[in-house]
Amino acid sequence: MGLPWYRVHTVVLNDPGRLLAVHIMHTALVAGWAGSMALYELAVFDPSDPVLDPMWRQGMFVIPFMTRLGITNSWGGWSITGGTITNPGIWSYEGVAGAHIVFSGLCFLAAIWHWVYWDLEIFCDERTGKPSLDLPKIFGIHLFLSGVACFGFGAFHVTGLYGPGIWVSDPYGLTGKVQSVNPAWGVEGFDPFVPGGIASHHIAAGTLGILAGLFHLSVRPPQRLYKGLRMGNIETVLSSSIAAVFFAAFVVAGTMWYGSATTPIELFGPTRYQWDQGYFQQEIYRRVGVSLAENKSLSEAWSKIPEKLAFYDYIGNNPAKGGLFRAGSMDNGDGIAVGWLGHPIFRDKEGRELFVRRMPTFFETFPVVLVDGDGIVRADVPFRRAESKYSVEQVGVTVEFYGGELNGVSYSDPATVKKYARRAQLGEIFELDRATLKSDGVFRSSPRGWFTFGHASFALLFFFGHIWHGARTLFRDVFAGIDPDLDAQVEFGAFQKLGDPTTRRQVV
């Protein structure tokens, strides 16, 4: 056809058979990527430490999505929760990956078949013999089938009626496991952190989709609406499909970045807002307070804090700390976490407990400032020693660790105290192994950050695509220069603009 490179899809504009073929091939590519990526991730994934080296620290992207849908076991004999298993069954991580690759191969063959056998009777209008599609009818079929799938997922898979359930955890990401979920039909179902809403909304949306699909299969659109929305034009389908996709992409970018029941922190890592609000820090202090009220010592109280909870309260796990273009997993940044050193408590020579002011998310460097319980600055690490009044040396700051590997150890040496004060800016203090992966010490984002950035970017791109193709289909006559009300026979090529006698071409 001699089309320019940016007109590639014009080839299948009036060719339903090959339009179907390219869509099947696209599905083959997507499924093939998903299966291949899953196998690659399984090849490099280390399941040995689900607490300090979980999937999100290792940069896993597709494993969390399989896990939240109920896959927890591997044919390698390990479970995502840390145990060993003997009978993982067919629907293991590898089983799901293999199913995607087999499906991809079948789609590949189907795409070739439909490309070769494009001229099928089903695509022809029996009245004219020309290729045409009954788009409103196809819309009804797709709506009905997607409604059935949506309803089935909510009513069977999520509820565990016929399926594994989904990943459910507590608000602090400590007790997560795959379990069946009962639909939440009350107002609590609208809370984005209530898993029951996932079941109820899929059941409700699926029911609506089934009814709407049956409606569109049994009722023809009015002629004015059909013409007004250009329902006979395949580009209308493209435009509205892009709208559905970009809307979904914006929604999931939000649920991922701000957090929801669909994006558990055990699978995707904590959100930046949990660091900003001191979410885990508050829970840790609450637990310590409860232990102290039971007449336990500081050492016993801090030793009861789960290492998993302490690890969430570390700025290196904040997805907003990694630059968008810093490639690699979190482990490639600050290293592989080996162990919790314990909670440092600083005191001045008068015995006051001091708290290190924590680094805000968007700072790379931050002054080391220690305040007392009333928020009054009592010590710091000065930029200019000559004018310092609150230096660690002058104030006589000491540090003692409670819980963790350094439990009961105290330091009064100013250099050591300052070292731990700097590290306390970043939350709880962990020993990090940078040698194994040659980690460079520069923070990386988690899959939560990548997913959000990718989906927000493509949603914006697809939004413009929707506007573009919507305008093309609504104003097709204007762009083509053909008056839709033109009923006279017009000779193509006689005029510079079709049907406009004022632009008659000059005969050479």
Curated annotation (Swiss-Prot):
PANTHER family with a match to the protein in the record: PHOTOSYSTEM II CP43 REACTION CENTER PROTEIN, PHOTOSYSTEM II CP47 REACTION CENTER PROTEIN
Domain of life: Eukaryota
InterPro entries cross-referenced by the UniProt entry: PS_antenna-like (IPR000932), PS_II_antenna-like_sf (IPR036001), PSII_PsbB (IPR017486)
Entry's localization field: Plastid, Chloroplast thylakoid membrane
Gene that this polypeptide is encoded by: psbB
Cofactor: how bound: Binds multiple chlorophylls. PSII binds additional chlorophylls, carotenoids and specific lipids.
SUPFAM superfamilies referenced in this protein's UniProt entry, alphabetically: Photosystem II antenna protein-like (SSF161077)
Keywords: Chlorophyll, Chloroplast, Chromophore, Membrane, Photosynthesis, Photosystem II, Plastid, Thylakoid, Transmembrane, Transmembrane helix
Originating species: Buxus microphylla (Littleleaf boxwood)
Transmembrane regions: 21-36, 101-115, 140-156, 203-218, 237-252, 457-472
Record text on subunit structure and interactions: PSII is composed of 1 copy each of membrane proteins PsbA, PsbB, PsbC, PsbD, PsbE, PsbF, PsbH, PsbI, PsbJ, PsbK, PsbL, PsbM, PsbT, PsbX, PsbY, PsbZ, Psb30/Ycf12, at least 3 peripheral proteins of the oxygen-evolving complex and a large number of cofactors. It forms dimeric complexes.
Chloroplast among keywords: yes
KW Transmembrane helix (keyword) present: yes
Name this polypeptide is given: Photosystem II CP47 reaction center protein
UniProt family annotation: Belongs to the PsbB/PsbC family. PsbB subfamily.
GO annotation, cellular component aspect: chloroplast thylakoid membrane; photosystem II
Lipid bilayer topology: Multi-pass membrane protein
